[in-house]
Regions:
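Short hydrophobic "strand-cap" motifs at the C-terminus of beta-strands
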Residues: 6, 146, 167, 198-200, ...
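N-terminal strand-loop element at the rim of the active site
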Residues: 6-15, 21-70
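A conserved mid-protein helix/loop that constitutes part of the nucleotide-sugar donor-binding site
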Residues: 20, 194-217, 229-232
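A short, histidine- and acid-enriched strand-loop-helix "catalytic/donor-clamping" loop
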Residues: 67, 96-97, 111-126, 139-142
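An aromatic- and histidine-rich active-site surface loop
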Residues: 74-76, 88-108, 115, 120
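A short, active-site helix/loop in glycosyltransferases that binds the activated sugar's phosphate group
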Residues: 138-178
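A short helix/loop element that forms part of the nucleotide-sugar donor recognition site in Leloir-type
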Residues: 177-191
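Nucleotide-activated donor-binding/catalytic signature segment of Leloir-type glycosyltransferases, i.e.
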Residues: 224, 232-244
Length: 244
């Protein structure tokens, strides 16, 4: 079986949670005889094809990005080519331009969509996008939510509950790097043995500003590990809250 994953970002340019989830799926499913491929956008497509963890990654040129939505003039042709050879197309939501490609390609293949996040911040743009979004979600065969709570709390998922299946994210512990004893001792000396740890892309919808507000007046160490569009904003927020 051949599965085509489609999302706006992927390794090696971006190492976020969605990218990790896609990579884990591609890697773990190899044992079941599934040949996974990933199509993504990149500002640098040299080379246009990569091998990562024994699966192929195809990169189309990123031509424009507006409100975290990447656009590409060349990706439609590549999507049609790869989708024609795929048995299943696996979309990763949200990415409004993906909806356009889905309908423009005219590919009649079984489709799965993993619903990673509601659209929270761009509410005005959501009003314009909503008709296309609902049509797109209606057209796919199955929608995957990562938890029962997410299915219950998302008004969008609630509209499509008949086709939603809950499948939690999974991570292979064998893929974890092994830290050196010296590195462990260094960080234990710096932050102690107990602390709150966040690891991931720094994005507005993850509520890290709420975490920083909750930390005021406490002596519990907080470690935020990651990068993303709100990194500078979070650093300023920590300074305003007098968190060092």
């Amino acid at each position: 079986m051949r599965v085509l994953h489609f999302f706006r970002t992927y390794y090696p340019e971006s190492y976020g949670g969605i990218e990790q989830a896609i990579c884990q799926l591609c890697t773990a499913s190899q044992a079941s005889g599934i040949d996974s491929q990933v199509l993504t956008l990149s500002p640098n497509i040299n080379p246009p094809e990569l091998i990562i963890n024994n699966h192929k990654v195809f990169r189309a040129q990123l031509d424009l990005e507006i409100a975290s939505t990447g656009f590409s003039l060349s990706v439609l042709k590549k999507f049609r080519e790869l989708a024609a050879d795929a048995d299943i197309i696996h979309y990763h939501f949200p990415w409004p331009f993906m909806d356009v490609i889905h309908f423009a390609a005219g590919i009649n293949k079984p489709t799965v969509l993993t619903y990673h996040s509601d659209i929270v911040r761009q509410r005005l743009l959501l009003l314009l996008y909503r008709p296309l979004m609902l049509r797109f979600l209606t057209s796919v065969d199955r929608i995957v939510a990562s938890s029962p709570n997410y299915l219950e709390s998302s008004s969008v998922l609630g509209r499509f509950s008949d086709k939603v299946r809950v499948i939690p994210y999974g991570i292979d512990k064998a893929s974890y790097p092994t830290p050196s004893e010296d590195l462990l001792a260094k960080w234990q000396q710096r932050i102690g043995g107990k602390f709150f740890l966040f690891v991931g892309m720094l994005r507005y919808y993850k509520g890290l500003h709420i975490l920083l507000d909750a930390a005021q007046g406490t002596d519990y160490p907080i470690v935020i590990l990651g990068a993303g569009p709100i990194e500078d904003e979070l650093k300023k927020h920590a300074l305003r809250n007098r968190l060092d």
